[in-house]
Every structure is written in structure tokens, then in C-alpha cells.
Amino acid sequence: RDRIAGWAGRDIQFYPEIKQLTLELAATAFLGIPFGPDADRVNQAFVDMVQASVGVVRRPLPFTQMGRGVKGRAFLVDYFGPMVEQRRADGSGEDMFSQFCRAEREDGSRLTAAEIVDHMNFLMMAAHDTITSSVTSMAWYLAQHSDWQERLRAECLSAAPAGEGLAYDDLGKLEETEMFFKEALRMIAPVPSIPRRALRDFSFGGYDIPAGTAVSVSPSFTHMMAEYWPDPERFDPTRFTSDQVKARHRFAWVPFGGGAHMCLGLHFAYMQMKIIVHHMLTRMRLEIEPGYAPEWQAWPIPKPKDGLRLRMVPLDR
């Protein structure tokens, strides 16, 4: 709350600001503690790991994305590793990390320290990288659509006054805010590709796909299919009214995947988004310079290359 309040009256690069915030939120939620003085180094380690996934050179050579990614992972292993025995000895924490440390398999064995660290690396990366991209996309569209920004501000204020936190029961009241968020994710999917492997032979689009073939779902393509999304390039949150959603194919909107492997963090993402947007819109207007159009990096996770320059204007001005 205080961090967001500090944006008022400033011109900010939104992406790095929100990334630091979501990393801190993820640390508090999943570790039970803030990162403290190591926050910047932890953040950079996650950035390096994600960028390594699309590095052209697939060996960890010096000065390559893969090399930086491997170093980033090694840092996180050293960071999380010593905490495992500490949490096991303590035995009382209710955060996700503590529960991983105490968890037992059906045969009574525990996860190894290496397995726990790998789980935490993935969980922390998933819990802040994609939501950073998603909220940044939403902020970009809020700044472009002042009419919708006013609608969502009114909805947020009706749920809770400025300066007050949303109660859990208030989250469901932000229906138009959720519609706007979903349309932002349709326009800029936080995960441009969802890799899978064919479990059986099948045919699709006139092609025969053998079992074992590496395949991929492209949300970015699916979200622009005119047969499901009339005038797909137009930004329109009313596409997500309950009637519209019921009338549409259930897999026409897949920023979080779908089926049995749908993103487990879906509702955590919605909750974070609503809390962040409530604190922003009840205190300030999001504005951009006339003609401003940032260039976006598409892979591995979309983000504005310049960080997204926003003017955060206090509502009393």
C-alpha cells in the first residue's frame, strides 16, 4: 500500500516498479519473510533464469544468456538451500516454503533439499513474473482508455475507500475490473506459448501428429481468431460479460492454459491484480504522453522495452 502511494505525483517506469512489488508480495506469501537487502540480487537471478529460456546459445558459456541463467539458478540454490533445515527444525511456519520442508510422501519420505529449492524457484518465478507482465499490460490499457479508468475507479471506491485495503469478500465486487483485466490478457497474453507433448497420435488442421511430438498452444494467436473474437484488434472489456463468456468456446481465452493443467496460481493472480489496481485507481490517474507507444518484448514473457513510462497524477490535482 505504502509503495503504491509513493508513486503519486511521479513519472515512473511501471514495469520495474511493479516487478519489485510483486516479488516482495510473493516472498511474503510463499516464504513468510521479505527478501530484505538481497531483494535486488534475487530479482536479477529470476530475470536471468527467465531470459536463459530463450537464449540462442544453449550452453552456459560466459557472457551468454544461458550462462547468466545458470549463475542465477546457482545463486538461488545457495540462497534457499540453507533455509530448508532451519524450517524443518522450526516446524511451525504456515507459509508454502515451510510446508514444503515438512511435507511427506505416501511412504513417509520427505522431499530432498534440492527438490524443495527447485519447487521454490519455479513457484517464486511463476508467482511474480507473469503477474508483473499482466498488471503492466493492464496499466498500459488503463492509461489509454480514460473512460474505462473512471468506471473502474468508481467500482473500486464502491468496494473500499482510498487508503483502505480490500477485504476478501470485496474482491468479488470488482466485476468490471476483472473484465478489463481479462481483455488486457487477451490482447497481450502473459505467456505467449504453452509447450506440451502429444500423449497419443492425433490429427489437427489436416496434419497427423504422432505421439511424443513436441507441440505448443499459442494464446497470442488464439486470442486473435476472428471466429471467436469479432474485430479482434479492438480493445473491448465487454467481451467478458457473463453472457458473452457463456456463448464462446471455453478454450477461446487461454492466458492461464486450460483443462487439467490450468495455472494453479490463477486466483492468486486475480487477487493480486485487484488489490494493486484498487490502491492505484483510488489514489491517482494513470496518464501517458500523447503519441507514446512503447515497443514490447514478446519472449519469453511480454514486457515494454522501456519499462512503460507512466505519469501517476494524484486525484486531487
Regions found by a protein language model. Name each.
Residues R1-S133, R151:
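Cytochrome P450 heme-thiolate monooxygenase catalytic core
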Residues T22, F80, H119-M120, V135-M138, ...:
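Structural preference for long, well-ordered alpha-helical segments in enzyme cores
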Residues Q44-A45, M49, L157-A159, G163, ...:
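Cytochrome P450 proximal C-terminal region
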Residues Q44-D48, G67-A74, S92-S98, W140-V191, ...:
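Cytochrome P450 I-helix active-site segment
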Residues T130-E155, H267-R283:
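Cytochrome P450 catalytic-core helices
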